[in-house]
């Protein structure tokens, strides 16, 4: 069986030249009127995949 890149992962994640994996923060689509401006500002920034999850991400992004 062929190894394939996970379609959902390739749409949501980007591997940087340093080896880190960039991702968009969640919880910013809707139902955020009750959130403080500080929370919304922090969630708007990009974040990185934690080291504990890197093995699973590397398996999804084989190519």
Curated annotation (Swiss-Prot):
Protein name: Large ribosomal subunit protein bL35
Record's compositionally biased regions (Basic residues): 1-43
InterPro entries the record matches: Ribosomal_bL35, Ribosomal_bL35-like, Ribosomal_bL35_sf
Record-linked SUPFAM superfamilies: L35p-like
Record gene name: rpmI
Keyword Ribosomal protein: yes
Gene Ontology biological-process entries: translation
Molecular function (Gene Ontology), one example: structural constituent of ribosome
Family under the similarity heading: Belongs to the bacterial ribosomal protein bL35 family.
Assigned GO CC terms: ribonucleoprotein complex; ribosome
Keyword Ribonucleoprotein: yes
Keywords: Ribonucleoprotein, Ribosomal protein
Origin: domain of life: Bacteria
